[in-house]
Amino acid sequence: MPASVETSDVISKPEVIVNETITLFCPAAGVPPPEVTWFRDGQALDNQTDDGIVVLDDGWRLHIPHAGISHASRYSCRAENIAGISEKHFDLSVLGNVTTIVIIIIIIIIYYAIGSRQ
């Protein structure tokens, strides 16, 4: 049976807030059981990368414990066996911390309020 990645319950455009944890899932199936490889912007990922990304459970999970803006990328999981290949893509967005956004808005409001008095 060719390798396949179940996609019906998988979010293809996940979002995470800065410094929060996110896990992407790659529910692969096939006979023989497929080998799963993760990619970031087309480059294969090792089991643990320099920027904290960890591949777990024989490739079934990609775990980012403290997401940063630099983690916003296209991630792909590829399930492959002798009968075929299947891929699933995830376009991960990393959103700024709500507190940081509120502070920036307050600074902008103060800046324009002071500027309009002059």
Please describe what each predicted stretch is.
Residues 1-102, 118:
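Immunoglobulin-superfamily
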Residues 102-115:
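Low-complexity, disordered terminal segments
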